């Protein structure tokens, strides 16, 4: 039942930070400004992303906290520090509460990633997991590249790893244009990653079977793809 999430010219950016974080009673859905930000069925996929981001140990940067699915999994791995950027007030409050119960050092950073990330030092992270929600129709399919091209390469240590997703975009691409998830990634993501400084031979993907519920508004494809992008 995936539907078009943004109408032409729509932007939520100015209202996003203080909009209500709509966690439902069963804690299986998060909506903000009527947008379906995250759902619990994504858990196996979020765990896959977390395993990649934590694979080098050390200091991990996570951009977007959401329902803490990836964040909680990351805390199970042998990492040293876990830096998390989140801009929504309600989600950030949940992050602060969650942080007090975790085994590793948590560094919560409040704000839009566009404002926070430029303040972070070069070569600081062993792993990065980027999973934020698009805040406008204009950046629906491209916001991850704004981060990756502007900052991901410089933030990683040599040998560090980046993983990311944009399910709101990929769900639309797999509905409207592609029926092969690996071809979608190859054609729409790889060229942008190479432009950002990563080498194609250091980019790999794994695909998992995962069936979204019928009522999911943003993703209906029955496979998910996890990228592993190494800085050398």
From Swiss-Prot:
Keywords: Methyltransferase, S-adenosyl-L-methionine, Transferase. Pathway: Amine and polyamine biosynthesis; creatine biosynthesis; creatine from L-arginine and glycine: step 2/2. It comes from the Eukaryota. S-adenosyl-L-methionine binds at residues 16, 46, 65-70, 86-88, 113-114, 131. One of its GO terms (biological process) is methylation. Monomer. This is Guanidinoacetate N-methyltransferase. It comes from Xenopus tropicalis (Western clawed frog).
